[in-house]
Amino acid sequence: MSEKDKKELTQECEELKEKYKELEEYAKRLKAEYENYREEVAREKRELIKNANEYLILKLIPVLDDFERALNQGEKRDAFYEGVKMIYKKLLNVLEKEGLTKIHVGEKFDPFEHEAVERVETEDVEEYTVLEVVESGYKFHGKVLKPAKVKVAVKPRKKEAEKVEKPSDEKE
């Protein structure tokens, strides 16, 4: 083998090594892209399932509301009442395991979680205090699906006579 052939083979070998490195890097990038793609597809699938569950749970909330109304009307010692109460608790438990939470009404009215359906004039409590829950509210994975319908305390309005005093007629 001549010196020229050796140089050509060495050069060709170097070129092949370089090409191998390029292909190896390309394969690594493809593998990383594929892993990222798999993770993204899995994330999208979880989000799709969550959204489908949200839709279903949103449709079931009125059923919970009806159960609550029935329980509030029923005789507490009646066997039928106890049966309905048991079904309500089971349904609520299943939905809570899927991410539904009842909005717990705090001391103050929160427009993001409550819907005021009635204003009650009173001086007995601080203004904008939630006095009563008319209909429960719910969140699904932290997102408000249905605000709680509540009665809110407001300051009593002053009587018109106290607010505006009529000026007396002056005769000249």
Swiss-Prot record:
UniProt keyword list: Chaperone, Cytoplasm, Stress response
Pfam families to which the protein is assigned, alphabetical: GrpE
Origin superkingdom: Bacteria
Keyword flag Membrane: no
Gene3D superfamilies, per the entry: 3.90.20.20, Head domain of nucleotide exchange factor GrpE
Coiled-coil ranges from the UniProt annotation: none
GO cellular component, one term: cytoplasm
Subcellular location: Cytoplasm
InterPro entries: GrpE (IPR000740), GrpE_coiled_coil (IPR013805), GrpE_head (IPR009012)
GO BP annotation list: protein folding
A molecular function (GO) term: protein homodimerization activity
Oligomer status and interactors: Homodimer.
HAMAP family referenced in this protein's UniProt entry, alphabetically: GrpE
Family: Belongs to the GrpE family.
Protein purpose: Participates actively in the response to hyperosmotic and heat shock by preventing the aggregation of stress-denatured proteins, in association with DnaK and GrpE. It is the nucleotide exchange factor for DnaK and may function as a thermosensor. Unfolded proteins bind initially to DnaJ; upon interaction with the DnaJ-bound protein, DnaK hydrolyzes its bound ATP, resulting in the formation of a stable complex. GrpE releases ADP from DnaK; ATP binding to DnaK triggers the release of the substrate protein, thus completing the reaction cycle.
UniProt protein name: Protein GrpE
The organism of origin for this protein: Thermotoga petrophila (strain ATCC BAA-488 / DSM 13995 / JCM 10881 / RKU-1)
